C-alpha cells in the first residue's frame, strides 16, 4: 500500500494521509505503519514519507469527495436543505431533531448537508454503535471523550467548534443517549443533529425524557409534487404555468403526465429512482412492497403481546385498505370505522382502545395521518379525526391496485391523498 497525499486540517496540522484513495488518520497509520510502503515512523513518533508527498486540504479532498459520491447516488434536490441551512445560520440554534418516516432520505440529506457545509463530520449510527459512542455518554460527554471516540472511529482529531457537526442517527435505539441530549448540548460547542425513524414512540415511553428547551424540530416527508417535478426539470413550469388555460397544450400535457405518474408511484426516493431508471410502474410497486414489509416487520418489534401484533396486522392490512374504499356518506369517526372493520376481520374480541393503540403507532411512524372536519364549514364546530390518509400516494395506489375497488372511488381517494399531503 502506498500513500499518495498528506492531508492537512484547517490549522495546517497533519490530519492523516490518503492511501489507495482512502483517508486514514495519523493515529491509525502509526499503529499500522508497516503496511504502508512509503511511510516511516521517526524516533520522535512523527510519520514521515520516504519521498515528499503533495498536500491536500481535508475538507476539499475528503468532504467534497464524500459529498460528490452521495450526490451521484442521490441526485434529488430536496427542500429540507433550506430548512437545515436556516437552522445552521441561526446564531442561537439548539440541537436539531429531524423527524420523518422510514426510507424518505433523512440520513442521506443530513450527510449531504454535513459534508457540504462543515469541515468535520462525526456520524454515529446507534443501531450498530461500532465505536462505542455510549462510552462518550457514560464518561461525561466532554471533549476528551469525543477525542477518544474520533480515534476509535479513525476520524480526525476532535475540533470543538461550529465547523464540526455531530449527527446521531436512529436515536430511538437508545434512551440513554436521547436523555443525554441536554448534557451534550451543554458540554460541546459543535452543532448537533439527532434523527430516527420512529421518534413518535419516544413520546409514550417512560424511559425517554423530553429535553425541553434544548431541541428545535424539522420534519421531512416523501418528495412533494414540486420536488418530483424538479427531478424531471419541470419545477419552473409548475410554478409559472397559466392556471386559466392560456398556456400551450404541450405544457399542460407534460405536467398532467407527471401528475398521473406521481399519483401512481408517490414520493419515496428509492421508488422514484426506480422509475427514472426503468419507467416501469410494476417495478416501482415492488419497491413499495419491500418498504411496507420492512415497516411491518419493524413495527411488530414494538408490540409486546401476540394479541397486539394481530390487531396491528389487521388494522394495517385489512382496515386501512378498506378505508380507501370508504364511501363519502360514511361519516363515522376514524376509530369507530376502524374498530368495526377490524372486528369483521379477526376472531378476537377487539375494543376501540386496542385499535387506537395500533392507529397511534401508524401515526407516530409517519404512515398514517388523520384529518379533522369543520362541520358545514364552521371552524367553531370541529369533528376530530374524521378521516384518515396515508402519507404517500404511491402507498395508496399500491394497496388499491391489489383490491377490488371501483375506479371512481380509487381515483377520488388517491386525489384526496395527494391534496391532503400537499396541504399538510
What are these regions (language model features)?
Residues 206-325:
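Interdomain motor-coupling "hinge/lid" segment immediately C-terminal to the ATP-binding subdomain
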Residues 106:
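Conserved lysine of the Walker
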Residues 98:
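Hydrophobic anchor at the beta1->P-loop junction of P-loop NTPases
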Residues 109:
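Hydrophobic positions on the alpha1 helix immediately C-terminal to the Walker A/P-loop
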Residues 277, 283-424:
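Accessory nucleic acid-recognition modules appended to NTPase machines
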Residues 186-207:
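Sensor-1/coupling segment of RecA-like P-loop NTPase cores
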Residues 128-157:
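Short glycine-rich substrate-engagement loop in P-loop NTPases that contacts/grips substrate
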Residues 37, 46-92:
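A short, basic N-terminal segment
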Amino acid at each position: 500500500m502506498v500513500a499518495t497525499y498528506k492531508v492537512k486540517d484547517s490549522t495546517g496540522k497533519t490530519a492523516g494521509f490518503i492511501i489507495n484513495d482512502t483517508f486514514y488518520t495519523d493515529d491509525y497509520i502509526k499503529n499500522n505503519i508497516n503496511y504502508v510502503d512509503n511511510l516511516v515512523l521517526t524516533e520522535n513518533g512523527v510519520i514521515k514519507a520516504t519521498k515528499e508527498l503533495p498536500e491536500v486540504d481535508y475538507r476539499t479532498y475528503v468532504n467534497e469527495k464524500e459529498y460528490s459520491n452521495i450526490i451521484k447516488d442521490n441526485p434529488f434536490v430536496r427542500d429540507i436543505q433550506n430548512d437545515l441551512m436556516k437552522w445552521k445560520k441561526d446564531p442561537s440554534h439548539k440541537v436539531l431533531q429531524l423527524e420523518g418516516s422510514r426510507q424518505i432520505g433523512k440520513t442521506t440529506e443530513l450527510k449531504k448537508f454535513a459534508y457540504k457545509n462543515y469541515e468535520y463530520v462525526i456520524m454515529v449510527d446507534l443501531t450498530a454503535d461500532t465505536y462505542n459512542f455510549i462510552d462518550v455518554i457514560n464518561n461525561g460527554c466532554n471533549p476528551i471523550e469525543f477525542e477518544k471516540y474520533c480515534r476509535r472511529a479513525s476520524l480526525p482529531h476532535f475540533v470543538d467548534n461550529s465547523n464540526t457537526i455531530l449527527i446521531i442517527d436512529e436515536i430511538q435505539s437508545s434512551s440513554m443517549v436521547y436523555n443525554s441530549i441536554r448534557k451534550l448540548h451543554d458540554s460541546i460547542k459543535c452543532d448537533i443533529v439527532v434523527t430516527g425513524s420512529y421518534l413518535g414512540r419516544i413520546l409514550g415511553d417512560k424511559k425517554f425524557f423530553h429535553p425541553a428547551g434544548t431541541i428545535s424540530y424539522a420534519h421531512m416527508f416523501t418528495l412533494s409534487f414540486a420536488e418530483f417535478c424538479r427531478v424531471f426539470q419541470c419545477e419552473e413550469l409548475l410554478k409559472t404555468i397559466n392556471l386559466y388555460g392560456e398556456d400551450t397544450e404541450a405544457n399542460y400535457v407534460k405536467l398532467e403526465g407527471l401528475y398521473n405518474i406521481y399519483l401512481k408511484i408517490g414520493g419515496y426516493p428509492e421508488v422514484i429512482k426506480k422509475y427514472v431508471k426503468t419507467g416501469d410502474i410494476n417495478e416501482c410497486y415492488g419497491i413499495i412492497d419491500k418498504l411496507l414489509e420492512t415497516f411491518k416487520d419493524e413495527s411488530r418489534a414494538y408490540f409486546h403481546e401476540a394479541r397486539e401484533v394481530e390487531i396491528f396486522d389487521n388494522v394495517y392490512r385489512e382496515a386501512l385498505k378498506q378505508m380507501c374504499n370508504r364511501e363519502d356518506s360514511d361519516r363515522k369517526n376514524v376509530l369507530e370505522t376502524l374498530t368495526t372493520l377490524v372486528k369483521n376481520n379477526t376472531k378476537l374480541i377487539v375494543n376501540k382502545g386496542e385499535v387506537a393503540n395500533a392507529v397511534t403507532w401508524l401515526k407516530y411512524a409517519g404512515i398514517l395521518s388523520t384529518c379533522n372536519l369543520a362541520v358545514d364549514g364552521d371552524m367553531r364546530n370541529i369533528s376530530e379525526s374524521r378521516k384518515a390518509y396515508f402519507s404517500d400516494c404511491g402507498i395508496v395506489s399500491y394497496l388499491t391496485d391489489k383490491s377490488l375497488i371501483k375506479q371512481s372511488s380509487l381515483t377520488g381517494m388517491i386525489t384526496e391523498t395527494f391534496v391532503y399531503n400537499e396541504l399538510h
